[in-house]
């Protein structure tokens, strides 16, 4: 959760550094309150709405508008995480934070959380490019072949992790490996979540 909230804060500051929600988002990202994840998400999506969409945008799997783009992007991310969990012999059915939710692979959802903002950034980039081309918000929100190619390329974006530059996909693998080490060691020390810095986009 620390990494996810921190990454959301970092991205929101890039999107709109003077947005009135930024100060509260920074504060919530480091608090110990139990509602931190939900509150950070609310603030994060308010920044997105005011920057890239419109003020009545609501993030939700079953909502309309740009939500379909985010749903598809997260499906790509989930597939990547599952691939590495299976390769490492980790059962995705046993999670940490998501075990009580309706997910079939809660561990995958746990480990993908810090990476969501990377895909959020590339979805926002897609929306920006579409609107610059004169497309309507409705057209920009369509899942086209070009969008699929654009969002899949997120996995090849160059990122920093463990003081090394690597494709985002390699960072996902490294995080899964570090989680496996933590499980085998019986302690959280070996686990290294991904922290978002500069991303050099592929595609």
Q: Which residues does each PLM region occupy?
A:
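Active-site helix-to-loop segments that bind/position phosphate- or nucleotide-bearing substrates
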Residues: 1-203
